[in-house]
Amino acid sequence: MPLGLKPTCSVCKTTSSSMWKKGAQGEILCHHCTGRGGAGSGGAGSGAAGGTGGSGGGGFGAATFASTSATPPQSNGGGGGKQSKQEIHRRSARLRNTKYKSAPAAEKKVSTKGKGRRHIFKLKNPIKAPESVSTIITAESIFYKGVYYQIGDVVSVIDEQDGKPYYAQIRGFIQDQYCEKSAALTWLIPTLSSPRDQFDPASYIIGPEEDLPRKMEYLEFVCHAPSEYFKSRSSPFPTVPTRPEKGYIWTHVGPTPAITIKESVANHL
């Protein structure tokens, strides 16, 4: 009903009630008329019987009162039916098994097309960064802190306990995904003829190989591979060529004239 209008009971015509209800046909009933629905219907029946024995006008009035008073029980019954249905629904809701819950709804994909930078960083669904995969790159030579290292170079490692240098030869280089450079070492064992204040490659022998590489920041460059014993590419001493060296022009250096081909042939003859 519209706001501001006072309801009026369709049976007793009262305008004040603690609670108002609607009947099955839409009539407005007060709380008192709703509560006495059964008694009103009984009284209406007796009034209707008396009306039949009396005059026609009285009978018509009694029938009218009986019809009006008989409507509340129907509304009460209809309301009771609705109330019972609500109670059944509430009980079923209470007794519902909550063990098996429905699957959560799938998250909606947020499209970032046409939106600003701040919206992209304020998304509700943060994505976890993938785990870093270690990738190792091996090399035969590296450049570290202005020094060009190669396989076979000799480096020194300072011991933390006694503070003495220990020499080793580089066996290989390793670089990880963070550009951290390391080297695999082969230790060089000194002999009785090895000097204490400097490194003499002729007096050292090759020792055990390390399984784990060491970082380049702990290594100090000593010298490149000094001889074939230390895996050098060329020997510092003259060697006899194992194959003929062709394509060279031989001549004398100095004031002595070069020997001609005819003179050399005549001398051999």
Curated annotation (Swiss-Prot):
**Which coarse location class describes where this protein primarily resides?**
nucleus
Subcellular localization is given as: Nucleus
Linked residues for Glycyl lysine isopeptide (Lys-Gly) (interchain with G-Cter in SUMO2)? K262
List, alphabetically, the GO terms of the cellular component aspect: nucleoplasm; nucleus
Biological function: Component of some chromatin complex recruited to chromatin sites methylated 'Lys-4' of histone H3 (H3K4me), with a preference for trimethylated form (H3K4me3).
Where are the annotated segments for Disordered?
63-115
Supply the name of the protein: GATA zinc finger domain-containing protein 1
The GO molecular function terms of this record are: sequence-specific DNA binding; zinc ion binding
- Top-rank taxon of the source lineage equals Eukaryota
Whether DNA damage counts among this entry's keywords is no
Q: Indicate the quaternary assembly.
A: Component of a chromatin complex, at least composed of KDM5A, GATAD1 and EMSY.
Task: Give the GATA-type zinc finger regions.
Answer: 9-33
Residues annotated as coiled-coil are none
Q: Describe, from its UniProt entry, the tissues in which this protein is expressed.
A: Ubiquitously expressed among various tissue types. Expressed in left ventricular myocytes.
Identify the coding gene: GATAD1
One GO biological process from the UniProt record? regulation of DNA-templated transcription
- Disease (UniProt): Cardiomyopathy, dilated, 2B: A disorder characterized by ventricular dilation and impaired systolic function, resulting in congestive heart failure and arrhythmia. Patients are at risk of premature death.
The cross-references to PANTHER family, in alphabetical order and at most eight, read: GATA ZINC FINGER DOMAIN-CONTAINING, GATA ZINC FINGER DOMAIN-CONTAINING PROTEIN 1
What are the UniProt keywords, alphabetically? Cardiomyopathy, Disease variant, Isopeptide bond, Metal-binding, Nucleus, Ubl conjugation, Zinc, Zinc-finger
